[in-house]
Curated annotation (Swiss-Prot):
Family of this protein: Belongs to the TACO1 family. YeeN subfamily.
GO cellular component labels: cytosol
Major site of localization recorded for this protein: cytoplasm
Protein name per UniProt: Probable transcriptional regulatory protein SUB0364
Keywords assigned by UniProt, alphabetized: Cytoplasm, DNA-binding, Transcription, Transcription regulation
Protein's UniProt keywords contain Transcription: yes
Positions of disulphide bridges: none
GO biological process: regulation of DNA-templated transcription
Lineage: Bacteria, Bacillati, Bacillota, Bacilli, Lactobacillales
PANTHER family listed in its UniProt record: TRANSLATIONAL ACTIVATOR OF CYTOCHROME C OXIDASE 1
Amino acid sequence: MGRKWANIVAKKTAKDGATSKVYAKFGVEIYVAAKQGDPDPESNSALKFVIDRAKQAQVPKHVIDKAIDKAKGNTDETFVEGRYEGFGPNGSMIIVDTLTSNVNRTAANVRTAYGKNGGNMGASGSVSYMFDKKGVIVFEGDDADTVFEQLLEADVEVDDVEAEDGAITVYTAPTDLHKGIQALRDNGIETFKVTELEMIPQSEVTLEGDDLATFEKLVDALEADDDVQKVYHNVADF
């Protein structure tokens, strides 16, 4: 499972990196975190978390610094979080999280992306009840039992710890993600491949042929929108 999450990050970075969209999206997220709190990541845990994730996605330092500098300025640009749920082909479900300065624009764009690419946008709650929000931490290692014990000793609410292909994947309660990361750092883990809040599907579907092609086109269209931060789904091996 650790390889799965690392591969998802690598795939997304490679795909988005060609157009620098991943940089722009992290730039907005960093700006918002810095604007809402202290622009110093050492005293703003939310900002530090976003910066760590940006580094995992290979966002250059100058992009990170530019977003923080913008937050230090007099700009009053406001961003609002949003969520749009919908359906793709053959039982596939999609959750889209956005961060936008223009909610009407974003809602229209997401609805269009669904409608023109083989999907249907549903009502709020129509899909999310089939997903569980969890913290996901991935790093190199193979001793899941020891990691599990270390996290329990640190009073971290852990759902599961898996070891596969030289990587350990930790699933935490969403409220304990930061505590879990710190506990692992306290036990000598310095480098993380993934530290994310994820919506994990309770069950997955497998798509093939035209259905898979349609689904990929739909996800690509959603992720291409500058206001879309995350796309979650229930399709296996995608």
